[in-house]
Amino acid sequence: MKTMKRVKTVTARSSDFGKWYTDVCLKAELIAYSEAKGFIIYLPYGYALWENIQKHLNCTLQKTGHQNVYFPLVFPEKLFHKEKNHIQGFSPEAAMITTTGKKNLSEKLVIRPTSEILFSQYYSKTITSYRDLPKLYNQWCNVVRWEKTTKPFLRGKEFLWQEGHTVHATEQEAMQQTLSILDIYQKLGKNLLALPFVCGKKTETEKFAGALITYSIEALMHDGQALQAGTSHYLGTNFAKSFQIQFQDCDHQKKYVHQTSWGVSTRLIGALIMVHSDDEGLVLPPYVSPMQIVIIPLQPQDDAVKQTSENLFSILQKNYRVHLDLQDKTAGWKFSQYELKGVPLRIEIGKRGLENDEVTIFQRYNFAKQNIKTKDLPSQIPQLFETIHNNMYQKALQHLEQNRKQATTYEEFKTYLKQGGYVAMSISGTDAELQIKQETGATARVILETNLITANCPVTNKKALQTVLFARAY
């Protein structure tokens, strides 16, 4: 058997959080850098994470009547100018195709930064009657935004996402859709990713370009910074009026449709890493992990060990994503590698344990080991996974709650902000929000539906109108 040292050491999280994060992404083989700056290669293990998110969300959206479609990567530049707020929001980072070969294109093509324009143009041609409504479309695709600063999964010039675009007859139906999707995203975090989200309405400054109302799901990373993990927008009739999307109602009256758009992206993978992982590498919740179980024979040349390992693999692979490692490498090397890759459950099978008809199981999230009867293992895995998932969620929730404070003075706000995490404060409006951003670097994450903390805004001394949750964010 080959003796190999583990060479993929991960930077300590406490010494350099940014380097630690990059190490985990690269050394757990989630991504690789490409030759084009700001564009990453999704390696099999990283892409499998995204596929598992896709499967979960697709299943939910199919039950709610949504249909998957695919729209083109590009659209003519002239369409970009139809919705003025939208173009102001996305023009700075929009990439365009201007030439083909040595010829200039007669009309520039915008590479989609998001697809409201494409969907609205299509809907304007196909919706005429109330019988055509609602339209509940979703697409899985890539988008391109020319970001200045990039970070794997969190911010890139190209990223993967799903974007839903729905059309409704009334404001009430569209708002119901907007909030329903927000609930779906929150449950995706809790039930698949073991991620607690703070959900709420965005301020006017932070809302989506072209939307009337934006809601978001916000996660708190281990370093105390927030991450916007998904959004759901009520677009009202803004795009409908710009693109003339009208329908005739049952009373033969012409009306503008009400639209929504919403999406989550590969940012969810970044959140998974930053919330759950540790100095040994990736830590993954069992339901989303590409490899849920790894079986490691401690003496693979021993017939009994090998046979037991293969039998157990045969049983478990019917219900789980399981891998049997028969590589000619030391058990210690294998342990380190699968800990680095965050595999939730490791099963160690050795001669000594088999004398008592036992195997050893190792849980990645808390490093707990225990012996268990071989015959009992398959029936106990569902409960093990449920316990692992719930404990990971509770740990993340505890971190969120312990790093959520409220301030009654601006100085108190600044002190809390330096400690990291969320800080709630009642403010007078956009003037206070922009001053806070300029002076502290904190941004408004969501508006809280709670009572005012103070009657006056600690920043402007004007009457407080709303309580907002602030944080420094990715």
Curated annotation (Swiss-Prot):
Family annotation (SMART domains): ProRS-C_1 (SM00946)
Listed InterPro entries: aa-tRNA-synt_IIb, aa-tRNA-synth_II, aa-tRNA-synth_II/BPL/LPL, Anticodon-bd, Anticodon-bd_dom_sf, Pro-tRNA-ligase_IIa, Pro-tRNA-ligase_IIa_arc-type, Pro-tRNA_ligase_II_C
Superkingdom of origin organism: Bacteria
EC id: 6.1.1.15
A GO cellular-component term linked to this record: cytoplasm
UniProt entry tagged with the keyword Protein biosynthesis: yes
Any GO molecular function: proline-tRNA ligase activity
Catalyzed reaction equations: tRNA(Pro) + L-proline + ATP = L-prolyl-tRNA(Pro) + AMP + diphosphate
Domain topic, free-text comment: Consists of three domains: the N-terminal catalytic domain, the anticodon-binding domain and the C-terminal extension.
NCBIfam families for the chain: proS_fam_I
Protein name listed in UniProt: Proline--tRNA ligase
Lineage: Bacteria, Bacillati, Mycoplasmatota, Mollicutes, Acholeplasmatales
